[in-house]
Amino acid sequence: MKILVLGSEGQIGRPLCAHLTSRGHQILGWDKTNSIKEDLSDSRNIKSLIETMESVDRVVFLAFEVGGSKYLARADKDFAYIDENVKLMSNTFKALTITRKPFLFASSQMANMHHTNYGFLKDLGERYTKSLGGWICRFWNVFGVEECEDEKTHVITDFIIKAKEGKIEMRTTGEEARQFLHTDDCNRALESWVNDEWDDIGQYYDITSFEWVNIIDVANTIKDLMGPVQIILGESTDEVQRGIRNIPSEYIKRFWVPQLSLSEGIQKVVEKIK
C-alpha cells in the first residue's frame, strides 16, 4: 500500500516510516524540515500536496508544531504557534476535501483541555476530521529518540540527557502522572489502521500504555538504568495538564495492545542516545 505520512521527520513520523517500509508499504513523507516546499502551513504548497495525495492510498496526518511540556509552557500562548498550526490544518484538510483520501488524524489526549491552545487546536483538528469522515487517534505521551532542538524535547529524553551529566534537575515536584508509550508500540498501533483493521470510524482510538506513572518514578527508572544519578526536585506543579486525568478508551485493544514496559522503552532510548 502507498502511504503519505505528513510530519514524516518527527519523533513519531520517522520511526513510523521506517516501520511501515519494513512491512512492505511504499511511503511518501512530507515534512517542513525536508524543504520549504513541504511546509503545510504555506498555502503555496497546497497544489503540490494535492498532487501527492492523489498518488497514494492513505494519509497519516501527524504534522503539528509541538514539543514537550517546557516548550508548551513557553509557546502555547504565542500568536506564531497558534497561527502556524491553524494554517497547516486548514491547508491539509482543504487538500483532503478535494482528494477524499482515507486519512488518520493524530490528535492528543489533551484535546479536551481547552485551558491550553494545544488542546484546543487538537480539538479543532478532530472537528475538521469528523466533518470529512476521517479517523481519529489520540496519542498519550509517546516517547522515543528525538532529533530536535533541546527546547522541544519531551520529559524522558530530557531526563536521559541530564542523567548523562549525572544530575536530573526536574521542573516540577514530580507528583504529576502521565501514561507513556514507546514509539515501537505506537508504530504497531498505527500499522493496524494502515492495514484497515479498525472497524468503527466513530471511535476515538487511544494509543497509550494504559498505565499511569508519576514523573518522579520516571526519573527513578532512568536512574536505575543509568547508574548513580542525583535527582533534584523542582517546585512547579502540573502547569500543562493541571492534574487532569482523562480515562482512555480501550476500544483499540481489539486490534492492538502495547507490549513494552516503561523500563524497556526507556532502555531502548538510553541505548540510542548513548
Q: How does the language model describe each region?
A:
Residues 61, 87-120, 135:
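Conserved Rossmann-fold NAD(P)-dependent oxidoreductase catalytic core, especially the SDR/UDP-sugar
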Residues 44-84:
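NAD(P)H-binding glycine-rich loop region in Rossmannoid oxidoreductase-like domains
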Residues 6, 57-63, 105, 206:
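Rossmann-fold scaffold of SDR-type NAD(P)-dependent oxidoreductases
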Residues 115-119, 123, 127-178, 183-192, ...:
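NAD(P)-dependent short-chain dehydrogenase/reductase
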Residues 28-48:
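Adenosine-cofactor binding site in Rossmann-like domains, unifying the SAM/SAH pocket
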Residues 42, 84-91, 102, 124-125, ...:
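Conserved cofactor-binding/catalytic machinery of classical short-chain dehydrogenase/reductase
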Residues 165-274:
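C-terminal substrate-binding subdomain of Rossmann-fold SDR/epimerase-dehydratase oxidoreductases
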Residues 3-23:
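N-terminal Rossmann NAD(P)H-binding glycine-rich loop of SDR-like oxidoreductase domains
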